[in-house]
């Protein structure tokens, strides 16, 4: 079957930059879906996305759809005809369903069968529908109309190129008749560009000052920005999302170095970086110590004969932005940070839970309570908690919401607060996402944990639990944040105690009955997914969860120990034995004695197991107390042989009641040893 290259390019007004790459990928995916359904093959694919165009190039696309045959079985022959050979309703209905006369149905087999040979269509006749369907299925939240057209798209369309080989595919899509004329750069090449063949597409546009390939533009911007930064003895801040957005804004990228007055460096650099990145799409430069340089890189969409004009234009545009940040910073510093709490008394956190100031007071008390348990200062944690929300009422955060916490840090330093108190005002929001940075100070960790626990307890306390994908207060993220801080920072905090303290802070604002247990269950349930992501089996998690440890750090240490235990050759047998023991003890009548009486032993294997348990108990108790869970389980693994021998030779449910009760007591001692670490019966 012969094949030819295929090109489709839809020209538009400037497409949304943040969505450009995803629109291109979706366009290609839709075309691939249509071609697959039509049974058409090709050797390679490429998507192109630039500010004013979406394009797909397929190499060696089949020019003819393959013929195909369909066979549809109908009712059995005996059900299709009556005794006289007349067709029944089943036969007539089958023929009608197939859209043919009964005489066209094959009646020679055990079942009626309709067979049809369908000749393949020319690919050129199928492509318009495939392309149109793909465009209609693009992930566009809001489509628009333009002019007198009734068509809808993300932006008004301007032209359409559709070529199969060197021939134009005759069609009209989104009010544009297909042709071979594309368009070049608005300024460098305002004339139309004739695309002779699909294979020449990229180079034809390159000659017209358009780099159609998104990845090529992105790499060029990244490389040239790094080179210019080195020339300025600095390094560029190039967030991937910003790089993608800038790439989507330009067809012919030309990075240029600009500057601003050094006086602006007195403003917190995070504010300057935020406004330059978010509002102007600039790449900021840092020196070797991570300090902001008074220079930045802009990416022009034109190769100017006088780049100085572009540089000066950008410098002129950014100056008011930086001046605003400077003004807000100076205004905020005119009053102590703590004074902003007065404004927060009128800002509602949650209607049933009070104001943001109320929350700050609760966080202050809870942080002061938590700090000593993790080795921190109660006084500093309490102070940081009280100041934790102050910057939310500042001019700086009002203009730049991303500065919450960061602004508080600078204002606290300006007021002479201790370094760890100032740092905690920013660290309270950590981690800001999965895998993000954790607090570095104990004061910051205490405030971060307190803030998250306060939110969890408060929102759970008024019954606003997260459901499905709805989690408006980010409670799942808060719970994971608490766990990450405690586990990864190796902080041994009893969450049961902390949550109960948090509940008391709310008084009658929440329904306290069962609230602590509900919040703790929610928090520790988050560990299940965390461990699954780490490749730890859910049974390992459940074996520890059954003991309900209050410390996340202790929980993790037990899980890691059980995971290591499961790799031992004795693990499976001991897990099965523990499961058997658990079942037996669960069926025991009456209370099980605490003491084992050797005088009731009548089998040597009972004595052997008892002796092994006694020795293991003496060795394991200190290990468990010191949380040396790996060592404890490794020592308990030695019980496999006496346990196996016991169950092979001893009938637990002996006829003699005292012997039976004593054997239950012996097994209870055995189970208790393992329960000092985890319920390994759940591993079986």
Curated annotation (Swiss-Prot):
InterPro entries xrefs: DALR_anticod-bd (IPR008909), Gly-tRNA-synth_bsu (IPR015944), Gly-tRNA-synth_heterodimer (IPR006194)
Pfam families named among the record's database cross-references: DALR_1, tRNA_synt_2f
EC numbers on record: 6.1.1.14
Places the protein is found: Cytoplasm
Molecular-function annotations in GO: arginine-tRNA ligase activity; ATP binding; glycine-tRNA ligase activity
Keyword Protein biosynthesis attributed: yes
Chemical reaction(s) catalysed: tRNA(Gly) + glycine + ATP = glycyl-tRNA(Gly) + AMP + diphosphate
GO biological process per UniProt: arginyl-tRNA aminoacylation; glycyl-tRNA aminoacylation
Chief localization: cytoplasm
Keywords of the record: Aminoacyl-tRNA synthetase, ATP-binding, Cytoplasm, Ligase, Nucleotide-binding, Protein biosynthesis
GO cellular component: cytosol
Family of this protein: Belongs to the class-II aminoacyl-tRNA synthetase family.
UniProt cross-references to PANTHER family, sorted A to Z: GLYCINE--TRNA LIGASE, CHLOROPLASTIC_MITOCHONDRIAL 2, GLYCYL-TRNA SYNTHETASE
Quaternary organization: Tetramer of two alpha and two beta subunits.
Name this protein carries in UniProt: Glycine--tRNA ligase beta subunit
Lineage: Bacteria, Pseudomonadati, Pseudomonadota, Gammaproteobacteria, Pseudomonadales
């Amino acid at each position: 079957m012969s094949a030819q290259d295929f090109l489709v390019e839809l020209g538009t007004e400037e497409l949304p930059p943040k969505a450009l790459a995803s629109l291109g990928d979706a366009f290609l995916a839709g075309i691939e879906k249509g071609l697959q359904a039509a049974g058409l093959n090709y050797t390679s694919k490429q998507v192109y996305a630039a500010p004013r165009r979406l394009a797909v190039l397929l190499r060696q696309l089949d020019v003819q759809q393959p013929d195909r045959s369909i066979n549809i079985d109908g009712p059995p022959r005996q059900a299709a005809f009556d005794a006289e050979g007349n067709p029944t309703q089943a036969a007539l209905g089958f023929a009608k369903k197939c859209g043919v006369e009964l005489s066209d149905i094959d009646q020679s087999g055990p079942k009626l069968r309709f067979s049809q040979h369908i000749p393949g269509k020319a690919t050129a006749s199928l492509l318009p529908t495939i392309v149109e369907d793909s465009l209609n299925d693009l992930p566009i939240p809001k489509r628009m109309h333009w002019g007198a057209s009734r068509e809808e798209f993300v932006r008004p369309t301007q032209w359409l190129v559709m070529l199969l080989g060197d021939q134009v595919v005759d069609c009209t899509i989104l009010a544009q008749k297909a042709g071979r004329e594309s368009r070049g750069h608005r300024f460098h090449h305002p004339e139309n560009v004739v695309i002779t063949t699909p294979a020449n597409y990229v180079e034809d546009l390159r000659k017209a000052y358009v780099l159609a390939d998104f990845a090529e533009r992105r790499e060029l911007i990244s490389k040239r920005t790094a080179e210019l930064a080195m020339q300025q003895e600095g390094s560029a801040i190039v967030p991937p999302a910003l790089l993608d957005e800038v790439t989507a804004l330009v067809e012919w990228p030309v990075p240029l170095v600009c500057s601003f007055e050094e006086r602006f460096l007195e403003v917190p650099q995070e504010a300057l970086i935020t406004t330059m990145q978010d509002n102007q799409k600039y790449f900021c430069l840092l020196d070797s110590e991570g300090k902001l340089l008074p220079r930045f890189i802009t990416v022009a969409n034109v190769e100017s004969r006088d780049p100085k004009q572009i540089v000066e234009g950008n410098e002129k545009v950014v100056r008011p932005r930086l001046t605003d940040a400077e003004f807000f910073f100076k205004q905020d510093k005119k009053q102590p940070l703590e004074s902003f709490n007065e404004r927060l008394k009128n800002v509602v956190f949650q209607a049933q839970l009070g104001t943001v100031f109320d929350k700050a007071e609760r966080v202050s008390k809870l942080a002061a309570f938590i700090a000593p348990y993790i080795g921190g200062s109660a006084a500093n944690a309490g102070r940081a908690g009280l100041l934790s929300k102050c910057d939310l009422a500042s001019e700086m955060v009002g203009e730049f919401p991303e500065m919450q916490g960061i602004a508080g840090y600078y204002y606290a330093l300006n007021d002479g607060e201790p370094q760890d108190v100032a740092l905690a005002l920013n660290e309270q929001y950590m981690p800001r996402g999965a895998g993000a940075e954790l607090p570095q100070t104990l004061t910051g960790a205490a405030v971060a944990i307190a803030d998250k626990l306060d939110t969890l307890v408060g929102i759970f306390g008024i019954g606003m639990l997260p459901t499905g994908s709805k989690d408006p207060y980010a409670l799942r993220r808060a719970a994971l944040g608490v766990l990450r801080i405690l586990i990864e920072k190796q902080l041994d905090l009893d969450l049961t105690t902390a949550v109960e303290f948090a509940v008391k802070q709310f008084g009658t604002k929440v329904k306290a009955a069962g609230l602590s247990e509900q919040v703790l269950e929610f928090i520790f349930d988050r560990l299940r997914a965390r461990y699954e992501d780490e490749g730890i089996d859910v049974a390992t998690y459940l074996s520890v969860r059954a003991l309900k440890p209050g410390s996340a750090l202790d929980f993790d240490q037990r899980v890691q120990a059980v995971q290591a235990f499961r790799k031992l050759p004795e693990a499976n047998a001991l897990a099965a034995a523990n499961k058997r023991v658990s079942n037996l003890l669960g069926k025991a009548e009456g209370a099980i004695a605490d003491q084992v009486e050797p005088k009731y032993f009548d089998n040597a294997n009972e004595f052997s197991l008892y002796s092994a348990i006694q020795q293991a108990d003496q060795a394991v108790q200190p290990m468990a107390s010191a949380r040396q869970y790996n060592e404890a389980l490794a020592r308990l693994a030695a019980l496999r042989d006496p346990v196996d021998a016991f169950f092979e030779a001893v009938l637990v449910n002996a006829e003699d009641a005292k012997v039976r009760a004593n054997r239950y007591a012996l097994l209870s001692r055995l189970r208790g040893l393992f329960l000092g670490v985890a319920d390994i019966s759940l591993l079986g």
